[in-house]
Amino acid sequence: MNLKIPLYDIKIKFYFDYDLDKSINKIKKKHNKKKLYKINKIDFDGIVIGEFIPKNKLIYVLIKKTKKGIDVDTLTHEIYHLTTKIMKHNGFKFNKTDEPFAMLNGKLNSMIIGKLIKNGKKLYYPINKKIKIK
């Protein structure tokens, strides 16, 4: 899935895969890189790669798929990181108010989850028994 946000002068490319190493290798090959910033052999469920922002105005978001579907906790977590990278790229600082961040984060979550649902992707909403909602 690809997004383009002209207002923030940024492009976003999403990879949803069972094996994120394959996605990482595609990105490394595309950009002729041997190593990507901050990616090591630690197992992870999602990552936002922002090292291509200065040159290509491009952010990658990688989310691991499972048999249960795309984990919404992981997805929204990574969208938060995506939001902060977009805002930092545009010179916003998280100081007097966090409202611009919150507005973009809410819109991105809504648009991305809506697009996944529209495209028939299976979403998984894990239940955390330590958080009680009545």
Each model region followed by its residue ranges:
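Active-site scaffold of zinc-dependent metalloenzymes
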Residues: N25-G69, L82-K85
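Short, solvent-exposed segments of well-ordered alpha helices
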Residues: T66, I70, K93-K96
